[in-house]
């Protein structure tokens, strides 16, 4: 019965905790209790049978109490008949004992304890007159007065010392308060200075940031301009190279024509390096070259005494143009180096 109650409680707890296989767990629990020797049902039966008296009705209990009172009266009457009066019955409630070498009465019943407490609550021993005791009492009184006087003196000295120490402490506290106020003012001034410096630093940082943004934007614009200029120079260089190649081709063609005409006329023409010759790109230079070529053809068709002297030579215009092209290429290289240096600085 008790084991079933425990199993039911365990089943409820497992269900509230959301644990599955409740029946198997409760069965294992009952087997474990039985295996370890915990006979819960046997314990419950022994507890209710031996611990508590048998149940009875109010009538039965009243009858037993009445029988107990009657038996008590019978015993008292029997003792009275045998000569046990009040004094005998009172003294029979005490025993004689020994405590620290002194004889004492030991109560055996509750009534005896009450009687002993009532007898000793107001008990006072009578004083035994003696001159020695009176002398000791007088000396004791004198010593008590001296002790009180010393205590008063000690108290007065301590009070004076405490008052002096309190005054010194008060002065020190006032001095500390003044120093504290001074330090507080210094802290306030320092805070104001710090706030002012923070504002100045913030303004400087903003100005530096703005300047840096402007400088960076200016650098970017310069870089874009330099890139455009480099691209323009590169394109111009390509155009110049194409023009030079075209002029060299025309010069070779003209040389072949001149050689052919010279061969027909039976003349000798000196070889000229065509790779180092060029002409001006302007209209005036083209016109002059055309006139020079016509005059050269006329001279070749009508040779004179100096026909074996080579004509042409180094063209001053070509030399000036080549020098100008070299200067432009040098400036282009310098611009490229400056641009690379600015890019490195920005990075």
Curated annotation (Swiss-Prot):
It comes from the Viruses. Residues 230-257 form a coiled coil. Residues 274-286, 294-305 have a biased composition (Acidic residues). Residues 274-321 are annotated as: Disordered. It is found in: Host cytoplasm. GO terms for cellular component: host cell cytoplasm. Signal peptide: none annotated. Keywords: Coiled coil, Host cytoplasm, RNA-binding, Translation regulation. GO terms for molecular function: RNA binding. Its main location: host cell. GO terms for biological process: regulation of translation. Residues 306-317 have a biased composition (Basic and acidic residues). The keyword RNA-binding applies. The keyword Iron does not apply. HAMAP family: ROTA_NSP3. Belongs to the rotavirus NSP3 family. May play a role in stimulating the translation of viral mRNAs. This is Non-structural protein 3. It comes from Rotavirus B (isolate RVB/Human/China/ADRV/1982) (RV-B). The lineage of its organism: Viruses, Riboviria, Orthornavirae, Duplornaviricota, Resentoviricetes.
């Amino acid at each position: 019965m008790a084991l079933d109650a425990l199993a039911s409680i365990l089943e409820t707890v497992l269900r509230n905790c959301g644990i599955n296989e409740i029946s198997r767990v409760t069965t294992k629990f009952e087997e474990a209790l039985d295996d370890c020797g915990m006979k819960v049902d046997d314990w419950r039966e022994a507890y209710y049978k031996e611990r508590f008296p048998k149940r009875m009705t109010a009538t039965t209990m009243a009858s037993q109490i009445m029988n107990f009172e009657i038996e008590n009266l019978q015993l008292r009457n029997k003792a009275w008949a045998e000569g046990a009066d009040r004094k005998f019955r009172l003294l029979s409630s005490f025993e004689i004992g020994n405590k620290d070498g002194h004889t004492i009465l030991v109560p055996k019943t509750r009534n005896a304890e009450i009687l002993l407490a009532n007898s000793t609550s107001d008990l006072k021993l009578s004083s035994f007159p003696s001159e020695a005791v009176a002398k000791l009492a007088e000396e004791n009184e004198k010593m008590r007065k001296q002790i009180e006087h010393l205590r008063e003196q000690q108290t007065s000295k301590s009070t004076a010392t405490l008052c002096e120490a309190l005054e010194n402490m008060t002065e020190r506290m006032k001095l500390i308060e003044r120093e504290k106020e001074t330090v507080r003012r210094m802290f306030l001034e320092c805070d104001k200075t710090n706030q002012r410096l923070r504002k100045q630093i913030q303004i400087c940082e903003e100005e530096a940031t703005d300047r840096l943004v402007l400088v960076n934007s200016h650098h970017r614009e310069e870089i874009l301009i330099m890139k455009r200029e480099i691209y323009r120079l590169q394109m111009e260089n390509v155009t110049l190279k194409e023009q030079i190649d075209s002029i060299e081709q025309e010069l070779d063609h003209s040389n072949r024509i001149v050689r052919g005409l010279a061969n027909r006329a039976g003349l000798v023409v000196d070889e000229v390096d065509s790779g180092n010759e060029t002409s001006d790109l302007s209209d005036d230079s083209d016109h002059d070259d055309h006139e020079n070529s016509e005059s050269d053809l006329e001279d070749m068709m009508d040779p004179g005494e100096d026909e074996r002297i080579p004509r042409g030579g180094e063209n001053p215009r070509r030399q000036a143009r080549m020098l100008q092209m070299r200067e432009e290429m040098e400036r282009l290289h310098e611009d490229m180096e400056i641009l690379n240096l600015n890019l490195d600085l920005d990075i």
